[in-house]
């Protein structure tokens, strides 16, 4: 990394504008080649200070409820698509206020709210989420098609006679996968729901497309989009979240102490449980600049956070020299599913949020403190 972080407080999330633009340009090229529309999935990345930049390349946002819908409406000002497994009565007025596309999870919810949507005076397009009962995701916590899933309408539950007023259909069955998975999934969707898609204005491929990953097959994605457009005559939407922010950000941490207990241990000011929860949830081991796998380099350490959770362990890493108090460690690919999922368990402060651009250098966008911790409690 070529950014001087010597003055950066830790822990801090740091997003590099140059890397973000690189991803956005690639996504924009898919739009230009196909005519599809691409939305930012805010559930993965909601750093709204960069929404004006993202708006130059993408068509809007997709939201998982009224809070995200309002954020996208106020901060990006383009298309706002909103989906939730169920909408509550008291929030529907705001969902309508901030959305121009609403996707319902069941025919019951559609029938419950369709009159309210129609009488709102807004030009809102409505859709239904499909569950084609096909997915190639191995981790059930991220698999919307596992047995007993609450997400989407299965072929057995589909009611063709209830489609009046429905403008589009939506499926989201992928998680950080390549376009060959999409190609196979689209075949199942076509076989199962194709006759209904032909009645629609749009088809939303959902998210989970790892489009900006170095080995992603763009040409297969292009073919899938063109197949849907040619076969059904629909506008195709994609909703990447992680792909927008993939490899654009870092989490900068400081070593607080080193101890021994049968192995070298280092305690950081950064918590897996609080600041990068997917490390424990997935689980996975994030890359650190200059570090190796255990025993690859001369000194191996287990890195842990400062909370009282015994399992607040980031992972085992090796280094060329011994770690010492004050050393800074830089975790890679920390822009997505971090800021949106972090928490203040144990009274942990939230990491600062920083942004680097060639025009303005390194800027601290936001810092947090006691009032942020206290304001969530009562």
Predicted regions located by residue number:
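Acidic, glycine-rich loop-and-beta core segments that form the ion-binding/anion-interacting portion
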Residues: 186-246
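Charged (often Lys/Glu-rich) extended helix/loop segments that serve as interaction or gating elements
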Residues: 224, 235, 240-378
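Short, well-ordered secondary-structure micro-motifs
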Residues: 51, 137-140, 179-181, 213-216, ...
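Glycine-rich beta-alpha junction loops
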Residues: 130-134, 173-177, 209, 242-244, ...
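A short small-residue
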Residues: 2-8, 167-172, 206
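N-terminal capping/small domains of soluble enzymes
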Residues: 2-77, 83-87, 271, 319-325, ...
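Active-site-proximal beta-alpha core segment in soluble small-molecule metabolic enzymes
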Residues: 36-202, 216, 224
């Amino acid at each position: 990394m070529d950014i001087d972080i010597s003055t950066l407080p830790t822990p801090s999330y740091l997003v590099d504008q140059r890397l973000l633009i690189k991803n956005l340009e690639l996504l924009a090229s898919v739009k230009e080649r196909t005519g599809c529309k691409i939305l930012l999935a805010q559930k993965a990345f909601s750093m709204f200070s960069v929404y004006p930049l993202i708006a130059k390349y993408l068509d809007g946002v997709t939201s998982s409820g009224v809070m995200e819908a309002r954020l996208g409406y106020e901060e990006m000002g383009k298309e706002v698509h909103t989906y939730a497994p169920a909408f509550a009565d008291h929030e529907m007025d705001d969902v309508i206020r901030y959305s121009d596309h609403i996707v319902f999870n069941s025919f019951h919810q559609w029938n419950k709210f369709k009159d309210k949507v129609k009488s709102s005076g807004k030009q809102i397009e409505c859709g239904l989420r499909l569950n084609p009962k096909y997915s190639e995701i191995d981790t059930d916590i991220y698999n919307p098609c596992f047995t007993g899933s609450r997400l989407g309408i299965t072929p057995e539950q589909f009611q063709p006679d209830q489609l009046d007023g429905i403008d589009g259909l939506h499926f989201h069955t992928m998680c950080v996968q390549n376009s060959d998975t999409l190609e196979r999934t689209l075949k199942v969707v076509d076989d199962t729901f194709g006759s209904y898609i032909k009645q629609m204005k749009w088809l939303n491929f959902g998210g989970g497309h790892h489009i900006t990953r170095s080995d992603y097959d763009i040409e297969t994605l292009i073919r899938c989009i063109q197949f849907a457009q040619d076969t059904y005559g629909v506008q195709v939407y994609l909703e990447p979240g992680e792909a927008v922010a993939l490899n654009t950000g870092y989490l900068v941490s400081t070593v607080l102490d080193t101890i021994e207990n049968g192995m070298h241990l280092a305690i950081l000011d950064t918590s897996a449980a609080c600041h990068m929860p997917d490390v424990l949830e997935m689980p996975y081991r994030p890359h650190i600049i200059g570090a190796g796998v255990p025993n690859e380099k001369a000194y191996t350490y287990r890195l842990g956070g400062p909370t009282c959770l015994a399992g607040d362990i980031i992972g085992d890493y090796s280094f060329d020299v011994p770690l010492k108090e004050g050393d800074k460690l830089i975790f890679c690919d920390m822009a997505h599913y971090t800021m949106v999922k972090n928490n203040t368990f144990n009274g942990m402060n939230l990491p600062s949020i920083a942004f680097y651009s060639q025009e303005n250098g390194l800027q601290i966008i936001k810092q947090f403190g006691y009032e942020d911790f206290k304001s969530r409690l009562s």
